[in-house]
Amino acid sequence: MSWETLAYTDAGIELLMDAVSGKQLTITQAVGGSGLANAAVLHAQTDVTGERHALELLGIKSVEENGSAARRVKIRITGAEDTYTLHQIALFGRQTGAAEDTLLLLVQDDRGVEIPAASTDQEFEFVFTVVIVISRDAEIVINLSAGCRFFSGY
């Protein structure tokens, strides 16, 4: 597992730039995809490729990454209805007043991770962290997934 291919989408870059300018950006959902896209066109994607799977948003934290201000978003993947190979992890968001979610970024791994059916492995859990490099001034919040508890110091 390398998960080295990360692309901010064209629409996602606009939302992040607006967040730096003072408009609040809410990260609304994390989604997994079973398909692969050419890395050269990931920036133009509007959704994940292949089957779509809802993932859990666990939290967001301001951090410093290689000397730059950033936000660390924590995502949890658990067993699905049916076994599948997870190749893409995406974050969606929207600005206050926007009608629809926008794909902010995609992380892709060519090999992927096999996600088992929950009926065969109820204990399976894969926690993934996405780092968004952005100014400390950006106003970014997150919608925690139902059933998640907030822990201070994440």
Q: Which role does the model predict for each range below?
A:
Residues 1-146:
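N-terminal assembly/attachment segments of tailed bacteriophage virion structural proteins
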Residues 150-154:
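Fibrous stalk/shaft segments of extracellular and virion attachment machinery
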